[in-house]
């Protein structure tokens, strides 16, 4: 597998409920590298652009209002297979269907307050990273324990 990047956002409910460090810890324990991190209250425009694929869905307005209602922790994680692995760490969009041990399975119960967003593919990851981060906000660095996490 090649090294890739994904966009992860801890939504306002996850921030307000104090899960930021726990969620970051799960990604670090998995062995992924954090290359971008910021906290912001997204504008309505940013939220609309981010969730544009859902523009015609009946829940779009509520989703935009929710995401822009409070602080979001936006992150870029890097590593081999990080997109698929992050999706597994996060769990099903519907928390009550999420497996125990996943972020949503352990920490959420309502689809409208499911704590976290993660890119669902390479194209989406690139779009979301470019939407939320400027190139200068991403940090290129090498972890000192890389040889202990991967043969490659």
From Swiss-Prot:
PROSITE patterns to which the protein is assigned, alphabetical: NDPK, NDPK_LIKE
One GO biological process term: CTP biosynthetic process
Signal peptide extent: none
SUPFAM superfamilies hit by this protein: Nucleoside diphosphate kinase, NDK
Domain of life the protein comes from: Bacteria
Active site: residue positions: 117 (pros-phosphohistidine intermediate)
Keywords noted in UniProt: ATP-binding, Cytoplasm, Kinase, Magnesium, Metal-binding, Nucleotide metabolism, Nucleotide-binding, Phosphoprotein, Transferase
Family annotation (Pfam families): NDK (PF00334)
GO cellular component term, pick one: cytoplasm
Residues where ATP binds: 11, 59, 87, 93, 104, 114
Enzyme nomenclature, EC number: 2.7.4.6
Enzymatic reactions: a 2'-deoxyribonucleoside 5'-diphosphate + ATP = a 2'-deoxyribonucleoside 5'-triphosphate + ADP; a ribonucleoside 5'-diphosphate + ATP = a ribonucleoside 5'-triphosphate + ADP
Cofactor dependence: Mg(2+)
GO MF, one example: nucleoside diphosphate kinase activity
Subunit structure comment from the entry: Homotetramer.
Its biological purpose: Major role in the synthesis of nucleoside triphosphates other than ATP. The ATP gamma phosphate is transferred to the NDP beta phosphate via a ping-pong mechanism, using a phosphorylated active-site intermediate.
PANTHER family on file: NUCLEOSIDE DIPHOSPHATE KINASE
Protein family (similarity comment): Belongs to the NDK family.
Name by which UniProt lists this protein: Nucleoside diphosphate kinase
Gene: ndk
């Amino acid at each position: 597998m090649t090294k890739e990047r994904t966009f992860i956002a801890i939504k306002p409910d996850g921030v307000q409920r104090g899960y930021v460090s726990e969620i970051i810890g799960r990604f670090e324990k998995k062995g992924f590298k954090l290359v971008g991190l910021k906290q912001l209250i997204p504008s309505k425009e940013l939220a609309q652009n981010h969730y544009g694929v859902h523009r015609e869905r009946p829940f779009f307005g509520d989703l935009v209002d929710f995401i822009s209602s409070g602080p979001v922790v936006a992150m870029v994680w890097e590593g081999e297979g990080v997109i698929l692995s992050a999706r597994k760490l996060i769990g099903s969009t519907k928390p009550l269907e999420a497996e125990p041990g996943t972020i949503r399975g352990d920490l959420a119960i309502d689809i409208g307050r499911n704590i976290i967003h993660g890119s669902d593919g390479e194209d989406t990851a690139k779009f979301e990273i470019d939407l939320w981060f400027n190139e200068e906000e991403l940090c290129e660095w090498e972890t000192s324990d890389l040889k202990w996490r991967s043969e490659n």
